[in-house]
């Protein structure tokens, strides 16, 4: 039926053109009623003639796919975070560092949308994968949900062999207010702010729910342009618009850092004038060649920085000061406040850090205080308002006994922290488990603090290693679980056994050992057994491992309780070696590019194999490329490889290299 297929294709073109005009150019050409009529006709025709339905049809934006879980996906290149600037001095220092390497520089300044980073992959012009940022290296695939966002094109307007795009998913203020109103009427808990609502919406297993949330997306970065080299960030933004993406129009170009600083000051006053939340500005070196010259640190690009708006300050009252015992035994005083709305959410508590901080600020129970969110995230007390004191305020004293276990509290010389002396303190054990299961550690989804409290109270666990001995029949009766949740939890626990050495080291909660240090130690020693034998002297020789960390690591592994805990993990089958150590590193130190349409495997699988065997799956061809794996319809990357004299392998030739 050529007439039906032609009508379907015409409808798709009309709808996608309308999406581009509305979201890409901000120039709507159809009324809502006209748009809805076209979409409903398309849905009806595709339902009557399913043989013409395609994955990139705009009808797929209404949702309908229900996922069982979100599979993990490794990003083509790591999604690094940005260094932060909080004032003019920080921006001047950033400019000094840049100009030390490049003399003439132009900056482009973009709005920092308060949402969540989303990575998109297009192959042969079609959207094939979308993922969350995750830990920067591995995220969750949420393609079906992202297809429901009209600002994300399902097919590029210009053909491209491969295109990796990064941008920010967000919820407009209007959508957020409507959603919370609906939830309030339904008796459901409200979202604290649009960012949380967007994050929750993108992680819905039912894509129809995501479609109803009316999310937005602004694209800002391209990793693999196929139309030659893009010379500047502004050229990248223009290219993205040409390809059908929604690009935030509020960007400016400046040639002097003083102009950037002045613009930042202007935007502090205008930050609330937009239909979406912004929490700062992103300043980038505009020239792409200069970006490459400046390069990256381990955590962030040297050519970009995020200017964070000054924190909004609000007055409230300290109703009480309560002690919380952490996983390392530190007693942290927390101010319980009269709830107030600040920087996008209601705040009822704020950390006071330690007794020295309380004394320095002279915070007392009953005080009127100004609070803010440090970095717009963590609530803190800025200062007291002494003129509002009545004389009834009470001075806080640090307890001499742990409020959780009544063990003595000590303060070691040279430290600001007070600590519980008992390693069996229930609060320390509870917080240690919460840390162990956290996303950047063992990443056991569905095991939040409330469930952990239940497991402890029911006597089902005493430490994190006991999680691996949990059984279905013991979980189902618990209040917050049930059959399906118990199944999902046990699967998440089982999956965590394969997390590898670096997350496990971080999850152990060793004092001074953060996520980065966990990766360094895993790379250095390769197995938990070798790390357990490490001495202070050899640990101190490792770059980025100082004396305090070395001493802490050595002492941790000397404890009998540590050996007992690790043995329980071993018996449960938890992997205690670096993930890469299981396979020969035949591609170690090699940068490899995959391009074109493959027949035997999909491209992402080949890139994963390259990394598992020690190589780097690069997104562009350069002189440093070891070789290119080329499938059918390989485009500009193949041409560039031939131009540079870089070896080109077929899919079969690549397969022969594998052990």
Curated annotation (Swiss-Prot):
Its cofactor is Mg(2+); Mn(2+). GO terms for cellular component: cytosol. DNA ligase that catalyzes the formation of phosphodiester linkages between 5'-phosphoryl and 3'-hydroxyl groups in double-stranded DNA using NAD as a coenzyme and as the energy source for the reaction. It is essential for DNA replication and repair of damaged DNA. One of its GO terms (molecular function) is DNA binding. The keyword Cell membrane does not apply. Zn(2+) binds at residues 402, 405, 420, 425. One of its GO terms (biological process) is DNA repair. Its EC number is 6.5.1.2. Residues 582-659 form the BRCT domain. This is DNA ligase.
């Amino acid at each position: 039926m050529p007439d039906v297929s032609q009508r379907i294709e015409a409808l798709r073109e009309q709808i996608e053109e309308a999406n581009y005009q509305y979201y890409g150019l901000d120039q709507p050409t159809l009324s809502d009623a006209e748009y809805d009529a076209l979409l409903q006709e398309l849905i009806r025709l595709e339902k009557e003639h399913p043989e013409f339905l395609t994955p990139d049809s705009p009808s797929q934006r209404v949702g309908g796919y229900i996922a069982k879980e979100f599979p993990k996906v490794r990003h083509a290149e790591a999604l690094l975070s940005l260094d932060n600037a909080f004032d003019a001095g920080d921006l001047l220092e950033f400019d000094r560092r840049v100009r030390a390497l490049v003399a003439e520089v132009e900056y482009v300044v973009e709005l920092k949308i308060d949402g969540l980073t989303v990575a998109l992959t297009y192959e042969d012009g079609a959207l094939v994968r979308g993922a969350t940022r995750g830990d920067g290296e591995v995220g969750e695939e949420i393609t079906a949900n992202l297809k429901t966002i009209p600002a994300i094109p399902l097919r590029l307007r210009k053909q491209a062999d491969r295109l990796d795009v990064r941008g920010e998913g967000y919820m407009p203020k209007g959508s957020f207010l409507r959603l919370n109103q609906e939830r309030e009427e339904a008796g459901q808990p409200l979202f604290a702010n649009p960012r949380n609502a967007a994050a929750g919406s993108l992680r819905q297993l039912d894509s129809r729910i995501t479609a109803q949330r009316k999310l937005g997306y602004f694209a800002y970065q391209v990793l693999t342009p196929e139309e030659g080299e893009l010379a500047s960030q502004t050229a990248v933004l223009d290219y993205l618009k040409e390809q059908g993406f929604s690009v935030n129009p509020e960007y400016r170009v400046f040639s002097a850092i003083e102009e950037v600083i002045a613009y930042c000051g202007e935007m502090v006053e205008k930050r609330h004038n937009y239909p979406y939340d912004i929490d700062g500005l992103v300043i980038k070196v505009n020239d792409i060649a200069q970006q490459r010259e400046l390069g990256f640190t381990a955590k962030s690009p040297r050519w970009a920085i995020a200017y964070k708006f000054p924190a909004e300050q609000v007055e409230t009252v300290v109703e009480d000061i309560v002690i919380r015992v952490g996983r390392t035994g530190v007693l942290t005083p927390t101010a319980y406040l009269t709830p107030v709305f600040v920087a996008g959410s209601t705040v009822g508590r704020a950390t006071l850090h330690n007794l020295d901080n309380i004394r320095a600020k002279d915070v007392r129970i009953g005080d009127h205080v100004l609070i803010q969110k440090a970095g717009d995230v963590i609530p803190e007390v800025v200062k007291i308002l002494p003129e509002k004191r009545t004389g009834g305020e009470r001075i806080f004293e640090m307890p001499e006994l742990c409020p959780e276990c009544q063990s003595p509290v000590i303060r070691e010389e040279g430290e600001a922290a007070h600590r519980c002396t008992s390693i069996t303190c229930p609060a320390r054990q509870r917080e240690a488990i919460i840390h162990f299961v956290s996303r950047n550690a063992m990443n056991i989804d569905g095991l939040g603090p409330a469930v952990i409290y239940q497991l402890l109270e029911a006597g089902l666990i005493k430490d994190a290693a006991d999680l691996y001995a949990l059984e279905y029949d013991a979980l189902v009766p618990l209040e917050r679980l049930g059959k399906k949740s118990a199944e999902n939890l046990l699967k998440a626990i089982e999956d965590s056994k394969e997390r590898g050495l670096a997350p496990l080291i971080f999850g152990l909660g060793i004092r001074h050992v953060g996520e980065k240090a966990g990766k360094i130690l895993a790379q250095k020693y390769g197995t938990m057994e070798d790390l357990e034998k490490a001495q202070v002297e050899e640990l101190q020789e490792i770059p980025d491992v100082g004396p305090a960390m070395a001493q802490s690591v050595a002492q941790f592994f000397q404890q009998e309780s540590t050996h007992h805990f690790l043995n329980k993990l071993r018996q449960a089958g938890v992997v205690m070696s670096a993930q890469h150590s299981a396979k020969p590193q035949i591609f170690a130190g090699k940068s490899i590019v995959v391009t074109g349409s493959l027949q035997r495997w999909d491209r992402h699988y080949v890139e994963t194999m390259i990394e598992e065997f020690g190589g780097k799956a690069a997104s562009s061809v350069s002189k440093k490329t070891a070789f290119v794996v080329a499938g059918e319809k390989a485009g500009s990357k193949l041409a560039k490889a031939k131009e540079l004299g870089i070896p080109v392998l077929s899919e079969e030739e690549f397969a022969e290299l594998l052990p």
